[in-house]
């Protein structure tokens, strides 16, 4: 019985160590992911927008809740509260950072089909146009974008 109790104690200690390591990795990943997504949102839509990830343990598993902020407040339904352009841009930023953080390192190529169909307004479109080459260079990524939108012409354009 004593041996079984010692074994249980060892297992519980190991579980605590794994939990501490997992939380450290989550904080590090959160910092990298949130900074890229927030920067994209701020660049295009203004500094009042932000992004964070809330990690929560449920039934022995960690779940991540992706949260868009406006003026520091959580948007419960960002699609209806801000429009699809915010979602389009956040989705792109999440795709980009997932490629950058993937291990083993993957080829940094991302093909997108109409990624900004919900971005409306000349000022927002111009900001997206300026953001794309900057992100591609900074994150060492190649972007291939299929679109019928003339406003999205960035870099080398191939028409079919």
Predicted regions: what they are:
Residues 1-50, 55:
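Charged, surface-exposed helical/loop "interaction arms" that form contiguous linear patches used
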Residues 84-109:
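GG-anchored amphipathic helix commonly corresponding to the ABC/SMC/Rad50 NBD signature/C-loop
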Residues 125-160:
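C-terminal lobe/lid and adjacent interdomain/linker elements of RecA-like ASCE P-loop ATPase modules
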Residues 76-81:
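Short pre-catalytic strand/loop immediately N-terminal to key active-site residues, enriched for Gly-Thr
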Residues 53-57, 68-72, 94:
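Flexible glycine-/small-residue-rich
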Residues 113-115:
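Walker B catalytic acidic pair
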